[in-house]
Every structure is written in C-alpha cells, then in structure tokens.
Amino acid sequence: MKQLLDFIPLIIFFALYKFYDIYVATGALIAATTLQVIVTYAMYKKVEKMQLITFVMVALFGGMTLALHDDNFIKWKVTIVYVVFALGLTISQIMGKPAIKGMLGKELTLPDAVWSTINWAWVMFFSGCAALNLYVAYHLPLDVWVNFKVFGLLAATFVFTLLTGGYIYKHLPHEPKQKNQ
C-alpha cells in the first residue's frame, strides 16, 4: 500500500501533463504530494526522510515553476533531489554509517564491506540520474523529458533495485545444504 502511494503523484503529474500542460501538472503534483505526505502520516504515524525531502523539493521548485511560469524549476527539482540523495549517502558513508545499512540492516545481515559497496553504488546511481536528467531536460523537448522523468527514471530505479537485490542475495549467509539420509 505504501509503495502505491508513492506512485500516485507521478501518475497524476503525467496524466495532467498529457491532457493540459506542465503548469497544471505541476500544480497537481504539489497537491498530490502534499496529500500523499498527509495520508502516509495518518496511516503510519511516520513519514520517511526521502519522502519528506521529495515533498519539500516538489513544493519549493513546483511553487517556483508556477509563480514564475518557468518549467526549468520543475526540471531542476529532479536533479536536485537526486543530488541530495547522493550527498546524503556519501556523507553517511564518510561518517562510517552507510545509510543503506540503516534502512535495511535490521532485516539483513551483511558484512560491512557489502553495505559500503551497495551504498557507493547508489551514490553513483543517483549521481548518474541527476546528470542524465539535466541532459534530457536541456537537450530534448519537454514531452521527452516528461516521459523520461515518469518512465525512464522509474524503470532505471526498478532495474537498479533488482540488481542491488541480486548483489545482496549473493552475499547473504546461506544455510548449508543437508544431505538426505
């Protein structure tokens, strides 16, 4: 249910962009993200840091997009969110407490070197997405950027999550196989 809530603002943004324009879609994104945070808090009595950062960035850059009638701000929001995530993971790594381990370490037992590798991999992923977003936003038409934001980045995140899962699985402690007697 929680994951479904994460996609609703994105779906609304995409649909309203296709039927109207970037400004209607941005206004709806701000409203949907605000509602998403409220519903998440009402249901779980907690809002994750990543969701809160995304909400603040949507409100700030979406608001600037609407106030100044300039779609560059909503384009920048995507890059800035990814840069903030990459910096957060980098700082956590430098401090010796990989954030990825903090998020998943209660459920998974892995060596510190594996957590470190996963953390750095996500730093690189978020940094790459930030750079790629800038390229698409400023070298391709707005329609292409919206599709990239909604489908391209979502697909890339899904694939990278699967790859991370495979890497984690490879390093999980496995029970020795018992021989049939």
UniProtKB/Swiss-Prot annotation:
Location within or outside the cell: Cell inner membrane
Keywords assigned: Cell inner membrane, Cell membrane, Membrane, Transmembrane, Transmembrane helix
Transmembrane feature ranges: 10-30, 50-70, 80-100, 120-140, 148-168
Membrane topology: Multi-pass membrane protein
Cross-referenced InterPro entries: YciB
Xref: Pfam families: IspA
UniProt GO cellular component terms: plasma membrane
Reported function: Plays a role in cell envelope biogenesis, maintenance of cell envelope integrity and membrane homeostasis.
Annotated family: Belongs to the YciB family.
NCBIfam families the record matches: ispZ, PRK00259.1-2, PRK00259.1-3
Protein's UniProt name: Inner membrane-spanning protein YciB
Higher taxonomy: Bacteria, Pseudomonadati, Pseudomonadota, Gammaproteobacteria, Vibrionales
Gene: yciB
